[in-house]
Every structure is written in C-alpha cells, then in structure tokens.
C-alpha cells in the first residue's frame, strides 16, 4: 500500500551540492512507490522529480523560509494527511517532528554531518532535542551515526543509509570527451579531478599549497581540474575562493597546472569529466565541528571507474574502500598524499577500473530506495 510522505527540505537543485542531489534522489525514489508531497524553495520547482506534488516557499532569508515552512507543513498535514513527515536535513527537523507529534504521524530526519555536529547554542537548545524526539534518524555514514550517539540520539532510532549513485553511469560520450580534450588542450595531460564546493573543509587551497607542488615536480604534465565554486546560499560560511587558490598556486609557480571550470549542473558534462580523469582527489580537512558527512563524489568517481585519493576523515571512510576504489591517507599528511598520487599515476594497475565500478554498484539509487522503503515499512508496523 502506498504511503503518503511529506518531505520538507531547503536542499534541492538548482542549489549545488551533495545534500541537494541526495534530497532530489530521495524524493524521486520514494515517489516511485509512494505518494510524495515535496515542500521546498521556489527555485526548485522546475527541476523537482516529476512524480512529486511540489509546494513552494521562498529560499531566503532563512528565517522566512523556516517560518513559512512551519505554516505550510501544518496546512499540508491538515489537508493532505501524510502518513510520514521526512526532514531532508537537521535544519527542518523541528518543523517535521513538531507537526508529526501534533497530528500523531511518524517522523524521519536525515542527518548529514554538520547538521548534527554543530555546537551553535540555539541549535543545541531547539534543534537537537527535536532531532532526538524523531521516530527515526537516518545518518549518511558511520561517523555521522557516531556523532548522533554522542549527541544523545537513541541507538534504537538510528539507521545508516549512505547516499547513492546513478549506476550504471551514463555511457561514455567519446565525441564530447574529444571536444573537451581539444577545448582545454588535455591530450598530453594527466588529470586530477576535484569536484565540490570551495569551502574550508574541502581543503583545496591547502592541497594546492602542500601537495600539488611535489606532484608537479614529479609529473610536470599534471593538471588539476576543479569543478565547483564558492557557494552563495550555504549556511556554512567557512569558504575558500578561486582567487585564494590561484594566489597560492602563483606562490609555487604552478598556476598553469590548475584549471577551474566552475559549477556543472549537466550530468552528461560532469560524467565526461569523470571519464577523463586519471584520479579524483578529495583532500578534505578534519574539522571537529564541521565534518565531511559522506563524500558522494567519491562514489560517483568510482562508478565511472575513476579511483579516489582522500584523507581518512568523516564519512569518507565509508565512501572510499581503501585499496579497492582508492587510497585513504592519514589526516593532514600532505607528503603521503602527494606520494600516493604520484605512485598511483605511475602504476595505474594498483587501482583498477573494474573494482571501482563493482564497489560503486552497491550504492545504486535502487538500493537506497529499497532500504528507505523497508525502513518506512518497519516504522509503520
């Protein structure tokens, strides 16, 4: 029997990021077997999953979004009578849990890392108690679950459902890949790929400062391709910028080894870059109150047969299978990071394409849908 599910989230495309892609896919997958109402910001309407009933409110300012989400959730509960209320992140948890209690429905909160780890006083007073009161809390990784336990969330309420990936990936478009190679003069390059928003946590500036110079010294034809930009709507204001990173590169005389291509929302273009890359680099910094919740880009890279070199911090330890889909490096050990990149580029057989893709298969969105539906079924029994 189909369930009526209301998903309340601020994180949807065209905003760019892993949380946005995850929430879109959760809504899309659940709508295949349930009746899904989606409450989010107005800009998301045109890109929302086609089987969802979309309800819109303004994205900014944040307090207006939260107030209107609170009011509109009440109205949807009153008129549509959903069986389950689902918060797409900790941000909307108080709204979802409050109205679920009032209407005697079930509540689910999906947490990503920062939205449970933050030590903001208001968050500790209002948000954490409401997350604890949810009927079910889904963590995106083992480290995020561990943070939940430390924050007092009952182990009986906790489940881990990692973000998914489109598998099999889009087929290789050889003509478009050739166009990219010609446009950016890539034919004789070894390509390192970085995909993600330019924040302090992603650590790209530190990578350029402390690891890339040694890589360039040993492999002069290396090119670091950066997909992503400084986020404009992020609640996390610890940011980096293209200008900062290029200034750091200039200090080492390696600006010619970096290519910024900006944000890419077209999956076909992004897929081609994954196929083009020799390695995906993920030099995320360990910041105690700002953890990397999972690392969807590592799974996306693996699905295309591209291995990842990453620091072993946060949920990355769930996203990268060490010695299978990549190599995990001790946090902040930039010397080992650069040596591992050099060794892997010179010995590509140590991390082969087939192992990467086989490992990525278990993260398919189909598997995510199955696990979500099982959880919903258990919640209603």
Predicted regions mapped to residue ranges:
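Conserved donor-binding/catalytic core segment of Leloir-type glycosyltransferases
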Residues: 6-8, 185-202, 208-212, 225-227
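N-terminal strand-loop element at the rim of the active site
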Residues: 9-17, 21-67, 143-147
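Short His-centered aromatic/hydrophobic patch
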Residues: 87-93
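Donor nucleotide-sugar binding/catalytic pocket of nucleotide-sugar-dependent glycosyltransferases
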Residues: 132-177, 186
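Nucleotide-activated donor-binding/catalytic signature segment of Leloir-type glycosyltransferases, i.e.
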Residues: 228, 237-264, 268
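Acidic donor-binding loop of glycosyltransferase active sites
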Residues: 257, 263, 275-290, 306
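Short hydrophobic beta-strand element within catalytic cores of glycosyltransferases
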Residues: 298, 303, 307-310
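Conserved acidic donor-binding segment of nucleotide-sugar-dependent glycosyltransferases
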Residues: 322-335, 343-349
């Amino acid at each position: 029997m189909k369930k009526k599910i209301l998903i309340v989230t601020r994180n949807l495309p065209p905003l760019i990021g892993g949380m946005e892609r995850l929430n879109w896919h959760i809504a899309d997958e659940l709508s295949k077997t349930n009746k899904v109402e989606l409450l989010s910001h107005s800009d998301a309407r045109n890109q929302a999953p086609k089987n969802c009933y979309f309800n819109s409110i303004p994205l900014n300012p944040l307090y207006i979004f939260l107030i209107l989400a609170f009011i509109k959730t009440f109205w949807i509960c009153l008129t549509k009578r959903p069986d389950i209320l689902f918060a797409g992140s900790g941000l909307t948890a108080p709204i979802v849990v409050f109205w679920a209690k009032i209407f005697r429905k079930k509540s689910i909160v999906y947490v990503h890392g920062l939205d449970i780890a933050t030590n903001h006083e208001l968050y500790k007073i209002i948000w954490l108690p409401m997350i604890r009161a949810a009927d079910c809390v889904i963590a995106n990784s083992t480290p995020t679950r561990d943070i939940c336990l430390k924050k007092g969330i009952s182990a009986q309420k906790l489940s881990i459902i990692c973000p998914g990936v489109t598998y099999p990936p889009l087929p290789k478009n050889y003509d478009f890949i050739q166009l990219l190679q010609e446009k950016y003069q890539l034919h004789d390059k070894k390509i390192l790929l970085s995909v993600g928003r330019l924040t302090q946590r992603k650590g790209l500036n530190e990578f350029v400062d402390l690891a890339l110079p040694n890589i360039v010294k040993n492999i002069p034809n290396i090119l670091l391709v950066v997909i992503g930009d400084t986020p404009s709507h992020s609640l996390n204001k610890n940011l980096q910028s293209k200008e900062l990173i290029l200034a750091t590169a200039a200090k080492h005389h390696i600006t010619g080894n970096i290519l910024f291509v900006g944000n890419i929302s077209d999956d076909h273009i992004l897929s081609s870059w994954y196929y083009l890359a020799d390695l995906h680099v993920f030099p995320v910094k360990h910041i105690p109150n700002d953890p990397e919740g999972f690392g969807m880009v590592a799974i996306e890279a693996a699905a295309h047969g591209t291995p990842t070199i990453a620091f072993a911090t946060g949920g990355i330890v769930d996203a990268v299978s060490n010695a299978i889909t990549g190599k995990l490096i001790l946090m902040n050990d930039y010397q080992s990071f650069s040596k591992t990149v050099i060794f892997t580029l010179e010995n590509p057989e140590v991390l082969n394409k087939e192992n990467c893709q086989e490992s990525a298969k278990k993260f398919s969105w189909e598997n995510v849908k199955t696990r979500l539906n099982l959880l919903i079924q258990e919640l209603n029994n």
